[in-house]
Amino acid sequence: MAQYEFTTKGPRLIWLPFWLLISARPRQWLKNLALFAPLVFEGEFFNPNKFFITIFGFFIFSMITSGIYIINDVIDLKSDLVHPYKRKRPIAAGKINPIVALICAVLILIVALFLASKLSSFFAYAAIAYTILQIVYSLFLRSVILVDVMAIASGFLLRVYAGASLIDAHVTVWFILTVVSLALFLAIGKRRSERTLLMASEEKTLGTRRILHHYPETLLDSLTIMFATASWLSYTMFTFLQPPPSAGPQVLVLFGDYLPRTFLASKWLMITVPFVIYGVMRYLYVIYEKKEGESPERILLSDIPLLTSVILWMVLVFVIIYGSDFLPARIIRYLQ
């Protein structure tokens, strides 16, 4: 059994902020970009007030996320010590005293929730609910089969509603279904990849999630396919039914006199559907062929085809929703 050691030598205390930052998992902050989704699709991305308040909300949720990850590392200290990779984390490696880490995490959460209360009451409620959900997940829910992935999806849903509450935006049913389906797809895919790594490991019990032993491989495969399909179908319905944002005329409305009714402006988001379908298929390839997927945020940043499809999707969404805002007035008058 690995032994935990911590010393209070000067250099370790000097490096405390650095090790805390590593434990905070900045890469995981990518998940909090979900707060920007209502801002983008509401057509308010370039509204300075709403943009900066969403930025503030993003940093608050990133603080909460970091605090939760530090607490999680303290809870998982014993299992991390025998894990081939997790034992290198600062707390498990003895770089930070667990008590000090726990105190810092609690302080981070207190400051984050205090700042959340200054933005809006509903945002604060969402932040509190998210914090409670993540703590309960770390202590209990992640050990309950199926409930663990539903808790992960609920976290994304709370992020979206938190972002919507900041700008007083309406969130459509199909958009919510898209978020939930995609979150469940990523969570199930993560479990599928973790189980693949577990079965390929010579030591199948040390430092692993116990819940993985209760997930039949056939069940994970079925759920992966189910939520992969639900993700692109729900997004497709969202693009079919999404009305033009209230921020102003879309660039393609300018061509209304030259196009048949088949190409109404409210349907132009359909152009982005193929990129979403490709992204889903590429992620399935990563899970099954490359035997990866246990870290969705890492895959997004390292898999070039997937990253390219996401970037192209984002560019198209911005062009369709905000393109007319960047056309010179003379060109707009000419086209009209």
Map each language-model feature to its residues.
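Topogenic membrane-insertion module of multi-pass membrane proteins
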Residues: M1-L81, G94-L107
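C-terminal membrane-associated helical module and adjoining short loops/tails
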Residues: A2-F18, L157, Y161-Q336
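Generic alpha-helical transmembrane segments of integral inner-membrane proteins
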Residues: L33-A37, I55-S66, I103-F114, I128, ...
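Structural signal for the C-terminal ends of transmembrane alpha-helices
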Residues: V40-F46, V136-F140, G189, V319-G323
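Short, aromatic-rich membrane-interface segments at the entry and exit
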Residues: N49-I53, S121-A127, I145-V149, H170-I176
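Acidic (Asp/Glu-rich) catalytic motifs at the cytosolic membrane interface
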Residues: I64-A92, L141, V147, I188-T196, ...
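Multi-pass membrane catalytic core of lipid/isoprenoid biosynthesis enzymes
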Residues: L77, V82-A127, V173-F185, L219-T229, ...
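Membrane-interface helix caps and helix-loop-helix hairpins in membrane proteins
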Residues: A116-S121, S138-L146, G163-V171
